[in-house]
Curated annotation (Swiss-Prot):
Source taxonomy: Bacteria, Pseudomonadati, Chlamydiota, Chlamydiia, Chlamydiales
Organism this protein belongs to: Chlamydia caviae (strain ATCC VR-813 / DSM 19441 / 03DC25 / GPIC) (Chlamydophila caviae)
Top EC class of this enzyme: transferase
Protein name: Anthranilate phosphoribosyltransferase
Amino-acid positions noted as binding Mg(2+) 2 in the UniProt annotation, renumbered to this chain: 223-224
Complexes and interactors: Homodimer.
Family from the record: Belongs to the anthranilate phosphoribosyltransferase family.
Cellular component terms per the entry's GO annotation: cytosol
């Protein structure tokens, strides 16, 4: 059956919403791995449509474990796939944003195309990443931040993980990941690895995602907000999208080089983030401030991006991100111990 849909996209046909839901269900339920890899490769080469991406999101969300948060929250996440091997900027930024008072429900996974995914670096920072929905809620309420490990909340995707890793290049799942937050956060900062995907995802968010506000962006070849160069993006809210171009130097940042943002394995990245949290000035610290400031602006805790950046910088320099990290690590490990004692 998957062969039929594969032939269709090879002939440059576009699939309907219902058809791509069926395709996704086939991939999750025992389709031939070679056909799955071929389908993903051809779809990537041909280019996904907003309707196709939305249909896949629908199929995956129906099989996900939902998280019901009784309050607004935000996620900071990227598509990955920029192959730049930078430090885990979105993960560090999420911790700083939580220190700025924004409830963070972060969704993430282990590395697929880099040396260190969000789950990997959080483990290296002492965080217990395997949380039930109830434990996740407790974390966000107590600390201001919690992490949803993708294999727990999207168990159906485990079957596709070896195929994705074996492909060695980004697929539609890089687009899907940031849009599959199990808590369906009302607010999001989403980094995108290239501008064509930025256009695609902006249409998906505008037409199919029910969020209050999303800031989608691409920054000089990265799926991160950094001071490397110009940032282009869309502010999506109230059924409209507004295109933005941001020059980081106009916000008081110094320009950096890609080498200034490089990371390595999870232990190295954890060390780099801790140094930034301790107030060590660097391009990485600037990136964390940039992202957390944008989060404050998107969430409505700052009237402008400039105001958000000012507040985020002050919060970082006061050591609040380091305090939140320590509190999160301690509380998550307490939850793990409590879980073990009940078994």
């Amino acid at each position: 059956m998957l062969q039929t849909y594969l032939q269709s996209i090879m002939n440059q046909s576009h699939l309907t919403y219902d058809e791509v839901e069926s395709v996704t269900n086939l991939m999750l339920n025992g389709a031939d791995p070679h056909q799955i890899a071929a389908f993903l490769a051809v779809l990537k080469y041909r280019g996904e449509t907003p309707t196709e991406v939305a249909g896949m999101i629908s199929a995956l969300q129906k099989q996900a474990t939902p998280v019901n948060l009784p309050f607004p929250a935000l996620d900071i996440v990227g598509t990955g796939g920029d192959l730049a091997n930078t430090v885990n900027i979105s993960t560090g930024s999420a911790i700083l944003a939580a220190a700025c008072g924004i409830p963070i429900a972060k969704h993430g996974n282990r590395s697929v195309s880099s040396q260190s995914g969000s789950a990997d670096v959080l483990e290296a920072l002492g965080i217990e990443i395997e949380m039930s929905p109830e434990e996740l809620l407790s974390c966000v309420q107590e600390v201001g931040i919690g992490f949803m490990f993708a294999p727990i909340y999207h168990p159906s995707l485990k079957k596709l993980a070896p195929i994705r890793k074996g492909m060695k290049f980004p697929s539609v799942f890089n687009i899907l990941g940031p849009l599959l937050n199990p808590a369906n956060t009302e607010y999001a900062l989403i980094g995108v690895s290239n501008e064509p995907i930025l256009e695609l995802m902006s249409e998906v968010c505008l037409k199919f995602k029910n969020t209050k506000r999303t800031f989608l962006f691409h920054g000089s070849g990265l799926d991160e907000l950094t001071t490397l160069g110009k940032v282009v993006g869309y502010d999506i809210q109230q059924g409209k999208k507004t295109r933005l171009e941001i020059d980081p130097t106009s916000l008081g940042f110094n320009s950096c080089k890609i080498e200034d943002l490089k990371g390595g394995n999870s232990k190295l990245n954890a060390c780099i983030l801790k140094k930034a949290f301790m107030g060590q000035q660097s391009a990485i610290a600037d990136a964390l401030i940039f992202n957390a400031g944008a989060a404050m602006w998107v969430f409505g805790n700052a009237a402008t991006l400039e105001e958000g950046i000012h507040s985020a910088r002050k919060t970082l320099m006061e050591g609040e991100a380091l305090r939140v990290l320590a509190q999160w690590a301690a509380f998550s490990q307490q939850l793990k111990l409590k879980r073990g004692s009940c078994n």
